[in-house]
Structures are given as C-alpha cells and as structure tokens.
C-alpha cells in the first residue's frame, strides 16, 4: 500500500484582463508521459499556490499573484470554484484542496520574471485566453470544467456557492 499524498491547501485566481481574457500558465508535466501522446507533456493552469502557515486563501492568492505575475495588491473577488483530490502533474504529487477566486486586472500587463523560480515544474509560458479559445482548445487545461465556470463569471452569473470541479484524470 502506498503512502497517502501530502495534503496541500491552495489558492488560485481566475485572472481576467479588461478584454475578459483569462490568464493561464503552461507547465511541463514531469510525470511519465505515454510516448504516443506527446501533447500531454504540457498542461495549462491558473496562477496560484499553497497557503503558508496561518495564511488565508485570499492572502495566499494575493501573494502568489505578486510572486508569479508581478501584480501587487490585486483585488481578490468571489470564490467561484473548488477542486479537491489527488493531483499528480506537478513534481510533488499532492492531495490538493484548491479554491478559485475571481481577479480582474486593469490591464493585461504582467511581469513573469520571477515565475520560473517559484515553481517546481518547468514553466513553458503564459497566455491570455478568450472564452472561445478556452472552449475550443484540445490542449490540457486543468481542472476539467474550468471553461464553464469562466462562461458563468463572464456572464455575471457568480455562483452562490463554489462550483465543484475535478481533475481530468481523477
């Protein structure tokens, strides 16, 4: 029997620019990949990271945005989704307890100079996605169901409680 994965509480942001595009970060998966599916080497994820001792999800989200995209004092909006369970795409697999908050930026200018040093997986880049691009993409975007949440948020339909999402391989 294998040891249980370490529990990690995580805050992430659905970061939107004024054109309603969503910011995602491309990572290289470090787990073994099926040679017949080289496209699985890359996956896209929202900015964010683990909570530090005594930190709230909102404070962690704000800190991570500063570290990863150079945005200080971002206004953290509503909690719109959660995703819980084993996640194995990062170098350190974890039993993730993720919370996703809406963040609207006044421009699309970000500074990713420190992004690579804050991550344990190779960072391949960042991209602003329109809703149409997100919905049509064949690329691996985590978690499953993210596009539906983005659609609701952009329509002004903030859920009364967080929507439950799941990992693609869960």
What is the predicted function of each stretch?
Residues 16-22, 30-31, 52, 82-86, ...:
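Short, charged/polar surface micro-motifs in flexible loops or helix N-caps
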Residues 25, 54, 134-137:
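Residues that scaffold the ATP/ADP-binding catalytic core of kinase and kinase-like folds
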Residues 5-7, 38-43, 92-97, 118-123:
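A generic structural micro-feature
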Residues 13, 79, 99-101:
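A structural signal for short, well-ordered beta-strand segments
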Residues 42-44, 107-170:
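Nudix hydrolase/Nudix homology domain
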């Amino acid at each position: 029997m294998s040891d249980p994965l370490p529990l990690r509480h995580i805050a992430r942001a659905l970061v939107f620019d004024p054109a309603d595009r969503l910011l995602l970060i491309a990572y290289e998966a470090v787990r073994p990949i099926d040679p017949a599916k080289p496209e699985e080497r890359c996956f896209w994820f929202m900015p964010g990271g683990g909570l530090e001792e005594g930190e709230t999800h909102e404070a962690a989200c704000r800190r991570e945005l500063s570290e990863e995209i150079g945005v200080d004092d971002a206004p953290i909006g509503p909690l719109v989704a959660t995703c819980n369970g084993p996640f194995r795409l990062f170098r350190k697999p974890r039993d993730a307890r993720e919370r996703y908050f809406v963040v609207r930026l006044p421009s699309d200018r970000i500074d990713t100079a420190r992004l690579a040093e804050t991550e344990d997986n190779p960072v391949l880049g960042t991209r602003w996605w329109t809703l149409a691009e997100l919905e049509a993409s064949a690329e691996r975007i985590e978690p499953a169901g993210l596009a539906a949440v983005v659609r609701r948020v952009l329509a002004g339909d903030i859920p009364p409680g967080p929507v439950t999402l799941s990992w693609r391989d869960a």
